[in-house]
């Protein structure tokens, strides 16, 4: 309260106090692609991160076997094509996150749009990986968009989730060069390697509290 009164209120700032002996609790959301999930779990099991992973959440059964390999509970809520049960699903997900005391969420190629309610519950605490060098090629199939446009590099971007699709504060980016010999399929393969690296870097920085967000941008402390 003293710090809040002395500094935060005066400068219209927000601050958080964390203790090193309390591990952040990270929930992972996935759909059908396994490359980012495997990379995150391998780093977790190798002890690279001071973090707990109490649950993996999905809208498909496809990756349950991965969760079982790492002995992490896997929860599935299927979403109808017309999204008529989307609100109900997110309520159930939010109850799980609260029960498991989740402090931040990683979207490891989770192919669903996060609602405003969940974003408000976890402001600047939902990390997404987008398979393009934002702000270029937002939305679906960015590698195919890049190939059709004839670009010479492709990239991946990890960012915090906001209400505007693929437009949140950027945490980490990287690129790789491509040539006329590449196909959409080869771009996807090259992109998957980038996605794993970029997402893991972003998660590392978040866990280490090295990110300051300001006006939809980030300041990264080394």
Question: Where is each model-derived feature located?
Answer:
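A short alpha->loop->secondary-structure connector
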Residues: 44-53, 71
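Short internal beta-strands
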Residues: 51-62
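Donor/substrate-binding cores of folate-linked one-carbon enzymes
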Residues: 59-60, 84-88, 100-222
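A conserved regulatory-domain signal marking ACT and ACT-like small-molecule sensing domains
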Residues: 1-22
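Short, glycine-rich nucleotide/cofactor-binding loops
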Residues: 27-35
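Adenosine-nucleotide cofactor-binding segment
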Residues: 68, 72-100
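Histidine-anchored nucleotide/phosphate-binding helix
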Residues: 35-46
